[in-house]
Regions:
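Blade-level signature of beta-propeller repeat domains, shared across WD40, Kelch, NHL, RCC1
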Residues: 264-302
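Beta-rich, blade/repeat-based domains predominating
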Residues: 1-5, 32-44, 91-107, 137-155, ...
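Structural motif
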Residues: 12-17, 56-76, 116-119, 165-174, ...
Length: 302
């Protein structure tokens, strides 16, 4: 059965509604702000982050010439059934908003890349709290990107992708609740689950499996990966690569009922990837749609 995705177009910033059946695309939000990156739906409202407007070096082409360290990112909202867009956190409230997720109970979580942190806020804009802050001295190694939450087990997962194509990416886990007497800069419950990854980006937790996109160097980068969620105090098993050949893989949505994962990339593609042992396992991956502009965040409409 055909379902719908929400996908983010980076430049110019738009929220797109995409049919998984025929690839039909239309804009849900025509002006989504500067460089939208992470998106999630909670209670029929779409929420997304923006990275903000970068400072550009005209002598350095591409992403390498874009500096997002200026604090002008935000978190934004739009009701799916129509209405007026609103600011959950206005531009400048965060530094560089990356993947966004929800606990399904009115709290949003996201990675702030140049801000070196994982934060949360209620959907009404109250209760802004940092859960993890990495040392500024870690530089690019401390930049937080992807995020997933497991409210049932009380866990938070996130990626630190490291330098581009650098093979120094990591995935961490910590508690959703702060240990007594500790703070976001110094937590005793942080676990390093995977290290030495090509360049992990967005996460999706589905039951006992953790899925992630990776935009690092081939052969293990520009891939969709999954691995079993490690037991507390243990490291993750080597990931299983489910699909390769993406053009800078970013966004990720998993439809476990249909046995499909959807991946968006900076090449403008949204690809459907059948999951092992699922109802579509006999199929090969296929493109749902190819658009002329880069795509980042992705979520499945409930």
């Amino acid at each position: 059965m055909s379902k719908e995705l929400l996908a983010l177009q980076v430049w110019p910033g738009k929220v797109l509604r995409v049919s998984t059946g025929d690839g039909d695309v239309h804009a849900l939000v025509e002006d989504a702000g500067a460089a939208p990156d992470g998106i999630v739906v909670d209670s029929r409202v779409a929420y997304w982050t923006t990275m903000g407007t970068p400072t550009t070096d005209p002598d350095t082409p591409g992403e390498a010439g874009q500096d997002f360290s200026r604090r002008n990112g935000g978190v934004h909202a739009f009701p799916l059934d129509g209405g007026t867009p609103r600011e959950v956190l206005p531009a400048g409230a965060i530094t560089t908003g990356k993947q966004l997720t929800s606990d399904g109970a009115g709290t949003l979580y996201w990675g702030d890349r140049e801000g070196h942190r994982i934060s949360r806020v209620r959907t009404d804009g109250t209760g802004l709290t940092d859960l993890v802050v990495t040392p500024a001295g870690d530089g690019i190694l401390g930049e937080c990107v992807g995020v997933a939450v497991d409210p049932a087990r009380g866990h938070l997962y996130w990626t630190q992708k490291g330098p581009a194509k650098g093979g120094q990416g990591r995935i961490f886990r910590t508690g959703l609740d702060m240990p007594p007497g500790e703070n976001a800069e110094n937590r005793s419950d942080v676990e390093l689950l995977w290290s030495g990854l090509p360049e992990p980006i967005d996460l999706h937790l589905d039951g006992d499996w953790l899925y992630w996109t990776d935009r690092g160097a081939a052969p293990d980068g520009n891939t969709l990966n999954r691995a079993p969620v490690p037991a507390p105090g243990t490291h993750g098993r080597p990931p299983e690569i489910l699909a390769t050949g993406f053009a800078e893989a970013i966004g990720l949505a998993v439809d476990s009922e249909a046995g499909l994962a959807y991946v968006s990339d900076l090449g403008g593609h949204i690809r459907a990837v059948p999951l092992p042992d699922g109802p579509a396992a006999a199929r090969t991956p296929w493109d749902v749609v190819t658009l002329p502009n880069p795509l980042t965040g992705l979520c499945l409409l409930p």
